[in-house]
Amino acid sequence: MSGLPVFSVLVVVLMLSAGAAALPELRRSPFPRWRLAMPPLLVAAATLVLLYLPPSNDLREPQLWTAALVAAVLGTVRGALIGLQVDQNSGRLLLWRAREGFWIAVVAALLVLGDLLAEPLGHVGASFSQAVELGLAILASFLIGRNTAIVLRSRDTPHGDL
């Protein structure tokens, strides 16, 4: 990531915020439905900032978007298979065996930190940055597909007190 330091700080803050927003999934505690939108949006925003920054500017790479599309489909399948309990009155939900949202945010943050730390230590090359960008695009797309499927399913799930 050879962009401005401001963008580097922005990307790190976005990734750490995504991890904090996904923490209720790890603790298996009920959380508001709107909170499902936060981790994918934050990870996707950080990924788009990284993809837009020079030297790579990979926004026009069809291979990247193809891999992201496949990851989104897999995320949608995963979201369809996650067990959930919904309190329709308060709009809160509880996910069963769905801790990957938090861990995806952690892995994405580690990828960004690895990219940030690898650059000053030596010339790693553009292939490492491209691998990080591809990994982030895959993780963000998976999370977007997963959480979109959960939100859509939660609207039709019968009421359960939480």
Placement of each model-derived feature along the sequence:
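N-terminal signal-anchor transmembrane alpha-helix
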Residues: M1-L59
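Structural signature of hydrophobic alpha-helical transmembrane segments
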Residues: S2-L16, Q63-G75, S129-A137
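Helical transmembrane-bundle signal
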Residues: M15-A18, A46-T47, A105-A109, D115, ...
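C-terminal ends of transmembrane helices
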Residues: S17-R33, G79-L93, N147-T157
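Cytoplasmic-side transmembrane-helix entry/capping segments in multi-pass membrane proteins
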Residues: P30-A44, Q63-L69, R92-F102
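Hydrophobic alpha-helical transmembrane segments in multi-pass integral membrane proteins
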Residues: L48-L59, A105-G122
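Helix-adjacent hinge/juxtasegments
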Residues: S56-Q88
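Helix-rich interaction surfaces within compact, conserved domain-sized segments
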Residues: E119-L162
